[in-house]
């Protein structure tokens, strides 16, 4: 994994020493972030504490979660950082984006993380696990944050700021893992073929992305689904019939991803004042070629029939060797692989039509559109 060392310096220094080199390639000391703010929508892959006080089985504010995070267990579903945490670092932010549940005051001007464990594109996905904040609810929460920003800055300045932010959306796994592939609890697999279900999800997802656009977003990082059939939980529950992974789950997720690419083309064509890119988390190099020796087992001890770490249990010693932290969620080490790929990969199979770094560097229409503030304070974001 030496090839990643040049991308990120020891990451925990981010929380200790301000204004340092996060990357010796991309950032300078005292440099501003490449975008002024970063908003995150998603599920447990991005959740950093929004579920902590909810009545749900999908919360992990206990040890050994956060064993490699300076603040310990925060509600992140991994041993250290999420993929979004690492992208935030690469973009040059000096602090991680706060969860909506605890974000206050001026910090929301740098962005908010709305992600919620067990959440899906569909409102009912994950409901058997308890309370969660679906994508539609996350959009409602974002509207409340916009209202606060407008109160702080005024409508015009708020509109200009929000138009320069990056919006990361990483959701959809629970619509399969905790919906379609639980036919004893949900009827989606009885109503839809995999092809029909992917089309239905994309239809709902497209509306949600357009809602973000209508609320002032202009820079979108849209993450596809990972290999959901390769998680230790999927293998244990569904079996593989001799394959390395549960192929029916991976195939279903790929149908979603295959529809997300043309959606990005459509959005870029229809909304020329915005930028949309697709990021493929399954496109990274093979785990063993990067030094990972365990790709199909969890690092921490899992309870019988479950997918989360047993509270207080002792995890594996060398976590850098494991792709998976628990039976569903990936380790800090693997999250870094995927995040760096999303940030600077030149492969169109991984980042299409451009990577996160390139998108952040593209001209922003809000930079040239200074007339909006001259139109009066009523111009700008509609809330």
Regions found by a protein language model. Give the residues of each.
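Terminal membrane/secretory targeting segments in land-plant proteins
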Residues: 1-35, 347-348, 352-383
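Surface-exposed acidic, glycine-flexible loop patches that form ligand/cofactor-binding
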Residues: 27-32, 102-106, 147-162, 210-214, ...
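Structural recognition of the beta-strand scaffold that forms the well-ordered cores
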Residues: 37-41, 45-47, 84-85, 110-116, ...
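Peri-catalytic substrate-binding/gating loops that frame the active-site cleft of hydrolases
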Residues: 39-40, 50-74
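Conserved SGNH/GDSL esterase-like catalytic core that processes O-acyl groups on lipids
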Residues: 63-203, 207
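Extracytoplasmic, non-cytosolic globular domains
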Residues: 171-282
């Amino acid at each position: 994994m030496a090839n990643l060392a040049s991308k990120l310096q020891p990451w925990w220094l981010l929380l200790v020493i301000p204004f340092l080199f996060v990357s010796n390639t991309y950032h300078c000391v005292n440099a501003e972030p490449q975008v002024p703010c970063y908003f995150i929508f998603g599920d447990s892959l991005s959740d950093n504490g929004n579920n902590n006080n909810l009545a749900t089985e999908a919360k992990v504010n206990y040890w050994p979660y956060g064993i490699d995070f300076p603040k310990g267990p925060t509600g992140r579903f991994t041993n250290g950082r999420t993929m979004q945490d690492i992208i935030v670092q690469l973009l040059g932010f000096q602090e991680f984006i706060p969860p909506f549940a605890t974000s206050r005051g001026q910090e929301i001007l740098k962005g908010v993380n709305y992600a919620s464990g067990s959440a899906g594109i569909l409102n009912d996905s994950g409901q058997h696990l308890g309370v969660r904040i679906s994508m539609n609810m996350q959009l409602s929460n974002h509207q409340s944050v916009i209202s606060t920003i407008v109160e702080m800055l005024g409508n015009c300045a708020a509109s200009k700021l929000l138009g320069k932010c990056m919006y990361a959306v990483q959701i959809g796994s629970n619509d399969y893992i905790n919906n379609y592939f639980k036919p004893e609890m949900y009827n989606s697999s009885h109503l839809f073929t995999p092809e029909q279900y992917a089309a239905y999800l994309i239809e709902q997802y497209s509306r949600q992305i357009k809602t973000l656009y209508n609320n002032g977003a202009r820079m979108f990082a849209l993450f596809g689904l990972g290999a959901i059939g390769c998680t230790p939980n999927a293998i244990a529950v569904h079996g593989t019939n001799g394959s390395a992974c549960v192929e029916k789950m991976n195939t279903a997720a790929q149908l979603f991803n295959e529809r997300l690419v043309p959606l990005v083309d459509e959005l870029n064509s229809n909304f020329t004042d915005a930028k949309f890119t697709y990021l493929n988390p399954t496109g990274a190099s093979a785990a063993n070629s990067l030094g990972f020796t365990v790709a199909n087992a969890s690092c921490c001890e899992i309870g019988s029939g479950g997918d989360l770490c047993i509270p207080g249990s002792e995890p594996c010693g060398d976590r850098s060797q494991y792709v998976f932290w628990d039976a569903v969620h990936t380790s800090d080490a693997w999250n870094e692989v995927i995040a760096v790929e999303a940030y600077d990969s030149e492969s169109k199979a991984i980042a299409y039509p451009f990577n996160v770094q390139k998108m952040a560097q593209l001209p922003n229409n809000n930079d040239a559109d200074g007339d909006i503030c001259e139109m009066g304070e009523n111009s700008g974001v509609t809330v």
